[in-house]
Structures are given as C-alpha cells and as structure tokens.
Amino acid sequence: MSDKTNDDKTLSVNTKKTLTMKRPGVEQSTVRQNFSHGRTKAVVVETKKRKFSRPDEKPEVEAAAPKPAAPAPAAPAPAASTPAPAQAAQPAQAAPVVRAPAPATPAPKPAAPAAPVTKPHVAQQRPAQQRPGGQQAQRPRPSDRSGMVLNTLSRSEMDARRRALEEAQVREVEERARAVEEAKRRAEEDARRAKEREESARRQAEEEARLKAEADARRKAEEEAAKRMPQPEARTERRDDARPAPQGNRPQQAGRPQGNRPPQGGRPQQGGPRPAAPSLADAAPIPGKPLPQSQLRKTVASDDDDRRGGGLTAARRGAPAKPEVRAPKVVKTEDDRRRGKLTISSNLEDEGRSRSLSAMRRRQEKFKRSQMQETREKISREVTIPETITLQELAQRMTERSVDIIKYLMKQGQMMKPGDVIDADMAQLIAEEFGHTVKRVAESDVEEGIFGVADNEAALVSRPPVVTIMGHVDHGKTSLLDAIRHANVVSGEAGGITQHIGAYQVEQNGQKITFIDTPGHAAFTAMRARGAQATDIAILVVAADDSVMPQTIESINHAKAAGVPIIVAINKIDKPAADPQKVRTALLQHDVFVESMGGEVLDVEVSAKNKLNLDKLLEAILLQAEILDLKADPSRTAEGVVVEAQLDRGRGSVATVLVQTGTLHPGDILVAGSEWGRVRALVNDRGEHVKEAGPAMPVEVLGLQGTPQAGDRFAVVANEAKAREIAEYRQRLARDKAVARQSGARGSLEQMMNQLQVSGTKEFPLVIKGDVQGSIEAITNALDKLGTDEVRARIVHSGAGGITESDVSLAEASNAAIIGFNVRANKQARDAADQQGIEIRYYNIIYDLIDDVKAAMSGLLSPERRETFLGNAEILEVFNITKVGKVAGCRVTEGKVERGAGVRLIRDNVVIHEGKLKTLKRFKDEVSEVPAGQECGMAFENYDDIRAGDVIEAFRVEHVSRTL
C-alpha cells in the first residue's frame, strides 16, 4: 500500500520507492465488497504461504541479512541499513549473531521513513550483481505488483508510520539481545541435561549388571535342576530363549554389537550393516531443527516391534534374542516432571515425554512375572468380625480391595457400597470366600475378664461377715444398730424412719462385723432386695409387741431368695405387751423354725432401748460366720457392689460401695455400672480417710464421672481406655433398652392417638430430684403404683443432686412440677422457677410426698356422674299455645317434679327423648316443684312430639369428685 500527495508525488526517503511495511511470506490482494443501496468497499486480503523445509535444506538464517544493494545513480543518498522486519519474526528458530546496524545517512526530510526491505527468498541468495547487464533488475512498482489502489496519506498517518518503523527497530534490537540470552540459557540447560543423562546411564548400567547377575544365577540354578531332571530340559531351554530382552532406556552391554542385529525370519539385510546407535549425548535434538523423517520412521518402527513382541518372535524361530537398538529417549529431569502444565512451546519441543525409572522398573518386573507365570501367594489372615461392620472396614481387615468385595456381592445379586453396614454372618461368608479365617466377637466381650476371676487359693484369708438388718418399719432396726455402734442415727433421719441404706463396721472381741441397714417402708422393696443379695447373714428384727408384719414377710422372702442364713432378733422385750413366744409361733407359718422350736434358726431376745443381750446377738453373728467359713483374696484387684450413690455439692459423685474381694486403693480406675472414674479418696463410715479398703469393708468412693445406680457391681480395670469402653457400651445398652421400652409402650403415632381417644388417659408430669439414687428409685416405684387407667404419673426426669436451672427449663418445656426429696434448689433455679411460674415442692418424708402426689393426681380424675330419681308424671292432655308450642297437662303420680331437672319421655315403656324441662306451671304460676297427686303443665326444651298417655320421668344429675 502506498500513499500519494495531491501532485502525485510519493512521500518517501527515496522518491523511486514506496513507503510500505510488507510482511514476509504474505501475499496481498484486493477484494471488493458489495453492500446494499449500491455501496461498495475495497478490502485488502492477505494470504500467508506455508513453507515446508526439507532436512537437506539450510535454514534461512544465513540469508536473513543480505547486503544492501548499491545505490542507484539517480539516488545519491545510500539506502539506510535498516534491519528487515521479517528478520525479527524468526528469533526463536536460531540464535543469529547480533550485528550492529550501519549508521544511516540522515534523510533530508525528517518525516520521511526509511526504505522498506522485503524478505529474500531462497532463490535470492545469489548476489544481484551477477545478473546480466551488470545492473539491478528494476523492481516492479507496488501498484503494478499487487494491483492496490493508492491513497493519499495525511501527516498524522505518516507520523504513525514513522513511529511504527522506529518501534520495530527497537523491538528487533531487544529481540536479538533476548535471543543471545536464550541461546546461553539453552547451552547451560543442554549441559545440565547431558550430565543428568550420564548419571542416568550410569545407574542403568549398574541396574543392568545386577539384573544380569541375577539372570546368570537363575540360569545356573535351572541348569542344575535340569541336570537332575533330564526330561524337562528342552522346555527349560526354550523358555530361556523365549524370554525377551529387558526393555527401556538402558545402554547396550559391553561386548555386544549395537547395530549388527541378525535379520528376523531369514530375511536378507538391506543396506548392509546398520550403523551403531548414536549415544545419548549425540541423540539430543538440535534446537530449532526437526528430527529427520528417516529417524522418526525408525523410532516408530522399533516401538511397533516392541509392542508386537519381536523378541518373542525371534526366539520362537530359533534365532537368539538380542536387545534391540532403540532410539534413545531424553530422560526427564525433576524440574520437567514437576512441570505438568501443557503449553504450546513445551508441546512443540523435540524432547519427547518418557516414563520415569520407577515406572520402567515396575513394567519390567510385571512383564517378567507374566513370562515366568509367577503368581503372588495368597496370604490367609485371621479376621476379627464384630456384630456389625462396614464393607470398607472388612476389606481393610482382610487387606483386600473393597472393589473385589463389591464385585463378589454383585455376582451374588446384591448391590452394595463400601460404606454399607453388614451383619456378622454376611461378613463371615465374605471372609471365608476370600480364604481367611474368622474370629467372631461381640460388643459384650468388652466385659469379659472383669468379674468372676478365680481367687488364688493360697492367698485366701478370713474376712469379716456382712450382716443385713431387715424387718418391718418401726420395729427398731436402726435403733438396734445404733445401740451396737454406740451412735445415734435415728435422730438424723426425717420422721424417725430410715430412708437410706447405710453400711457400717463394728468390732467385737477383736473381730470386725459389717452391718448394712435397710429401710423397712413398703416403698423400699428394692433396697431390701439389694441388701439381701450383698450380704452373708440376715438379721430379722421383729417387735415383740407387734409380731410378724407385711414387710417382715417380705424380708423373709428376700433372705430366702438370696440364700443367706437368718438370725431372728426379737426386739422391744422391755415393753409390757411383749410376747416373744407369739413371734416364734407366727414365724412358723413362714417356714422360719427357731432353735427353741426345734429348728436351726438362731433367735435372740434383745432390747435396743435398754441395750439388753446385744453381746449375745454379736456372738450369734460370729458363730454363724465361723460356720460359713468366709474367706477372700486381698491381693487381687477389687470387686464389689454399690450400696448407695449420691451427688454431693462439694464432693461430686459419691458412691457407698462394699468391697467383696480384693483391696481397693486410691488411684485405682473403677467401673461401676455405666460410670467410671479414678478413685480420688476413700472415706469410711466414721468420716475418716483410709489408704485402702479390704474385703467386706464399706467405704465411700470419690472421683466417679457420674452417679451410678444403687446395686450396680463395680470392678477395678487396668487402664482408662478399658474403663471408658466398658462404660460406653453399658450406656449404649441402657439407652437402647429405654428406647425399646418407650417405643413398645407408645407404639406408633397413630396408635398413641387412638389409645388417647379410646382410653382418655391423663398424665401428671413430674421432675424428681433426690439426695441418693435409692430414694429416687423408691419414689419412682411408689408413684408408678398410684397410676390407674385414667391418670398416671409420668416421670420426665429423675436424678440425684440439687435442683438446677436445667431442671427448671425441662419442667417448663414439659409443663411438669418439680419435687425435691432432701435437696434444695439453688438461687438461679429459684429465680428461673419464679419467672416461669414453675412450682417446686420440697419433701423429706416419703409418706408426705406420695400423699401430695396422690391428691394432685386425684384432681385429674373426671368427676363421677350420679343420677337421683325424683318422680313420674302422666300426660293427660296436650295443649297448643301460641308462641310457646305444645304444653303437656300432667298429673304427678310418684315422687315430685322439680323445675330444671332432667326428664325422660317414655312411650310404651321406651325412652324416646331425654332432656330438660323448660317450664313448670301450676295453673298460671311458675313453681319450683310439684308434689305427687297434683296437676301441672310442662314444656320441654326443643322438643314438641308429646302425646296423651306418655310418662315423664324426672331425675337429678350430680357430679362427685373422685380420689385415687
């Protein structure tokens, strides 16, 4: 493209040359576009020619900078030695030498740019001076060559062209400098890669030598085996010959020709002996020069031969297998491996992608195993299978892939995922199918070895007897124990009755006796049962003036169920109405035969108030213990039973335990029921801290994580992990039982709604907090017995300890009342209860608690409907009165009729209507009642179908409140 002035003179340095910027290898042409309304536009279209270079061609770097032509006579100013823009387009193909541009003669006009220089073709390498005539060929005009339309350039366009040429010159200088730096960097990179190739070749040579030594040793062993077994010798040799040569980028072994591979299949060699394979250093590709097509064809052919197993083919045909000559591959360095981004520049590089050494080694080992028919030996393991297990965990325990297990299940017709849970039976089938042995375990196995450990017979020593005092309420059990202990426990009990189970230890004639005091109230049945189970001897206290009572009979049954001997203590013999012989006779009805009546049960007449015959009672206890021959092993870990448990504000969870065997020390890790903890302190019945608790010794244990249930067994375990595992298992078991019990009682939502509609049962929600677990259990059992078909008490929450804010929140959510038994609420709980309107009631006697709850539950009962007969009246005549309706003229035949009473209309001895009287008149006056023998007028509410001869029955309905 060129521009002209108005006088058709070209603006350029040389008046004979047009100012152009022609791109090398690009042809330009003009295309005219047609638009609507007869408009047209000429568009310049550039066509880029692709030049394909042959391997024997020289690159165009040598002809990149031709000498400038001699100036023409008509133009004395020499052409500026401006570098061609086309030369800047190929800096990456080669590293040309940077030539300093010749100083150009300043142009007479500052706005005139330098003369354009076009890229010479390959045929233009000959100097222009050799053309015939000794003159340069006249260049065709641009307009003649391309047929473009010449337009006039403005001054701004000429300035833009000039600035573009100057920027092109600056860019060319910068690109040449960058090319020099790139060439230097590539040289350093090539040197580093060559060093790495040498190191890799050295390692491969060492690996080849090691493999060769192993192959020689294996071959010698096979030859020796073949000598001993002559028959399979031929097969062994054929297998050795058929084994392929190692593959990969390994250097050729010394002593072997690298290029003289014998022809396969008897084919003659073409082209004589093949040249030796180039070394790794020589095989490095030249930057900017593509790999020759012949070398590419050889490389591809060798790869195809490897894939087709050419070594095996040659071995089968009888030719000795020799390693093939493969085109060396460039080993990737660590930086190249880490550079995972695929770019155009990296993809166009001649360095091919190659496998790592580890991948090649694994590939060779796998190929060798496949050739030698070596299979990995199946390892059979003992797999521990719990009750439930996931497929993923089962696969890990068998060291199998979960995919293989899923495939096996799919063959069996079951679609499962690795996270699915299966039972122990299915897991056992899968493990046995995969060749493993199975060991079945259950969650309850965590408790194995805790209880029932056999004692060492040589370490057994005598232990004190454990005695439980049982009997009816107010028969003097606690008073008798106080007299023995020289203490006063009765004064500390609310209401003078025992509501806790207590354990004490006394000493008589140098021998210790452990006493367990149980409540006698009917609500404490479970306490008496626990006391009988944890004892050796049961003392049955019977008042001489009261004889045998219901709780006395219950205590006898508990002792017989526990299988413990009974000693009868006939108390209160100091009273005038005492009759010990009556007590002995009454005990005969319950199979208790005392010695004085010809039986084997010891009986002692005592008086706790006057302390009479207490020594005889203790002697009887020691005699019975001597007969039982009680022994225990104090050197083993401690086991026992929880007598009582409570939550103390200052000390936390406190459990009163009875050590049955072993010795308990501070610091031992204890598991009691679903709670565990480390023993922080041991306190005896006198409040003293002790260093150990031996067999048959009651102590208070501090340090448990929670409050256990009374009656739970405890044991000492080895570590905290074992204790935590046992406690979690028991908590989960208790939670599952509670859920099953609730779901079984409630059923589904529809069943619950139907049950409520049919039965109409009302609930009285309660939150119960007590001082000890035994009292809470007794209160819960007593409240359950109060329930009927219409109303029952629902225990929302129960626990040992004081009343807290969480209890108030729970009571608010469930609309329940809070009951505190021997506990109080803290200030925050009281404030929250006042704010929310929650009632808190405190009790210290179980009688009062049960009576109040019973009265409150009675208020929920629907009142009883009572019907009282008043009288009958006969309808004599029916009158129709305006604005009133039908009025019956009646005579009272029996009793009386009251206004507002309920009435029934009887016709032919059938009740056809039941309602109320609207009006009752005698003559024209309203009256309250009409006695028998008098006449009156009656009208019914919302009913007019009355006839003469019908009978009206009057009655009164009363609602009477009920109690439980």
UniProtKB/Swiss-Prot annotation:
Residues 496-500 are annotated as: G2. Pfam families: EF-G_D2 (PF22042), GTP_EFTU (PF00009), GTP_EFTU_D2 (PF03144), IF-2 (PF11987), IF2_assoc (PF08364), IF2_N (PF04760). Keywords: Cytoplasm, GTP-binding, Initiation factor, Nucleotide-binding, Protein biosynthesis. Residues 571-574 are annotated as: G4. It comes from the Bacteria. GO terms for cellular component: cytosol. SUPFAM superfamilies: Initiation factor IF2/eIF5b, domain 3, P-loop containing nucleoside triphosphate hydrolases, Translation proteins. Residues 1-379 are annotated as: Disordered. Residues 607-609 are annotated as: G5. One of its GO terms (molecular function) is GTPase activity. Residues 517-520 are annotated as: G3. It is found in: Cytoplasm. Residues 27-37 have a biased composition (Polar residues). GTP binds at residues 471-478, 517-521, 571-574. Residues 77-102, 114-140, 250-278 have a biased composition (Low complexity). CDD domains: IF2_eIF5B, IF2_mtIF2_II, mtIF2_IVc. Residues 462-629 form the tr-type G domain. Residues 1-10, 156-227, 234-243, 323-338 have a biased composition (Basic and acidic residues). Residues 471-478 are annotated as: G1. Residues 103-113 have a biased composition (Pro residues). Belongs to the TRAFAC class translation factor GTPase superfamily. Classic translation factor GTPase family. IF-2 subfamily. PANTHER family: TR-TYPE G DOMAIN-CONTAINING PROTEIN, TRANSLATION INITIATION FACTOR IF-2-RELATED. NCBIfam families: IF-2, small_GTP. One of the essential components for the initiation of protein synthesis. Protects formylmethionyl-tRNA from spontaneous hydrolysis and promotes its binding to the 30S ribosomal subunits. Also involved in the hydrolysis of GTP during the formation of the 70S ribosomal complex. This is Translation initiation factor IF-2. The lineage of its organism: Bacteria, Pseudomonadati, Pseudomonadota, Alphaproteobacteria, Hyphomicrobiales.
